[in-house]
Amino acid sequence: MIEFIRGYVDYICPEYIVIDHNGIGYEIFTPNPFAFEESREAAVTVYTYEYVREDVHALYGFLTREERNLFAKLLQVSGIGPKGGLAILAAGRPDELARAIEEENEAFLCKFPGVGKKTARQMILDLKGKLTMFSMPTAPRPAASLSGELAEAIAALKALGYAEREIEKIIPALREETMSTEQYVKRALAMLLK
C-alpha cells in the first residue's frame, strides 16, 4: 500500500492530476483536482488509496488522510465504487457526511451524485457508528481574497444553480487570470461543462 506520494503537480485535468516524483509521473484520481492548482510551484503531499482489481489498478489521492480514510470506508458500502466515492467526497465535507449517516438523514445523503434511497440506506446500515473520527468539523482551508469581478462571477454561477462545491473546484484556475465579470463567467462555464 502506498501511504502518500510527495512531488510536484505536473498536470491537472477534471478527473485526475499527475504528480512528478523523481521523474516518474503518477496518475492520481482525486475528488477535486483543481484544489492542487495552488501547489504547482511547491512539492505537495497526496495521501493515496491504491485500488487493485483484476481489470483495474488505479491510485486515488486526497489532500488529507481524513479524506482518504473516509474514501476507504465508502468503498466498503455495497453499491459504491471508486467513482461514486470520489463524487461523494467532491460534493460534501467529511463531517457533514458522517453527521448525516449518524443521524440517519437519508434525504441529505440522496443529494450526493449517484446516491439514491437504496444506497443511502445501505450507507447508514454499513457505516453508522464507524465514522466518529470524522464527525468533528475540519478547519476550513485559508482562501485568498477574490477580486470584485471574480466574486461577481461566482455569484452569477450560484444564481445559475451551480453548487458551491462545484464552483470551489474551479476557483484556483480562475484566480490565475484577470478578466471582466463576463469573461470569468464564460471561462467558468466552459470549465464546468467539460
UniProtKB/Swiss-Prot annotation:
Its main location: cytoplasm. It is found in: Cytoplasm. SUPFAM superfamilies: DNA helicase RuvA subunit, C-terminal domain (SSF46929), Nucleic acid-binding proteins (SSF50249), RuvA domain 2-like (SSF47781). SMART domains: HhH1. Residues 147-194 are annotated as: Domain III. It holds the Pfam family RuvA_C. Residues 143-147 are annotated as: Flexible linker. One of its GO terms (biological process) is DNA repair. The keyword Cytoplasm applies. GO terms for cellular component: cytoplasm; Holliday junction helicase complex; Holliday junction resolvase complex. The keyword DNA damage applies. It comes from the Bacteria. GO terms for molecular function: ATP binding; four-way junction DNA binding; four-way junction helicase activity. Residues 1-63 are annotated as: Domain I. Keywords: Cytoplasm, DNA damage, DNA recombination, DNA repair, DNA-binding. Residues 64-142 are annotated as: Domain II. Belongs to the RuvA family. Homotetramer. Forms an RuvA(8)-RuvB(12)-Holliday junction (HJ) complex. HJ DNA is sandwiched between 2 RuvA tetramers; dsDNA enters through RuvA and exits via RuvB. An RuvB hexamer assembles on each DNA strand where it exits the tetramer. Each RuvB hexamer is contacted by two RuvA subunits (via domain III) on 2 adjacent RuvB subunits; this complex drives branch migration. In the full resolvosome a probable DNA-RuvA(4)-RuvB(12)-RuvC(2) complex forms which resolves the HJ. The RuvA-RuvB-RuvC complex processes Holliday junction (HJ) DNA during genetic recombination and DNA repair, while the RuvA-RuvB complex plays an important role in the rescue of blocked DNA replication forks via replication fork reversal (RFR). RuvA specifically binds to HJ cruciform DNA, conferring on it an open structure. The RuvB hexamer acts as an ATP-dependent pump, pulling dsDNA into and through the RuvAB complex. HJ branch migration allows RuvC to scan DNA until it finds its consensus sequence, where it cleaves and resolves the cruciform DNA. NCBIfam families: ruvA. Has three domains with a flexible linker between the domains II and III and assumes an 'L' shape. Domain III is highly mobile and contacts RuvB. HAMAP family: DNA_HJ_migration_RuvA (MF_00031). This is Holliday junction branch migration complex subunit RuvA. It comes from Geobacillus thermodenitrificans (strain NG80-2).
